[in-house]
Amino acid sequence: VKTYEAVGVVETLYFTVAIEMLDEMLKSSNVEFLRKETTLGGKLITLFVGGSVSEVSNAIELVKNLGEGKHINHLKNAIVISKPHPEILKYVISSEKIINEETLKVNN
């Protein structure tokens, strides 16, 4: 499992808001999109990003600013987990992504 200095977790309402927040995080910070989860019939979206502590913190701060302005009441939570435990990374990085990466290695 790949390691990251930090993992950012964002919970927001509505898919379109999640996509916009993810786009802003990826454009503004050197973070990698790790995975998404949907609950409540797709109404609640959880995004996971990884990278250095400073870059993940920057991405999460940007999302919080969006949540206080344009998307007030849509952002439910946004946190940074510094130095995540390896078990957290196993959960965050889905087995599907690991399988896809291994398939790419075999095919290349």
Where do the language-model regions lie?
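Long, contiguous binding/interaction regions
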Residues: 1-44, 50-108
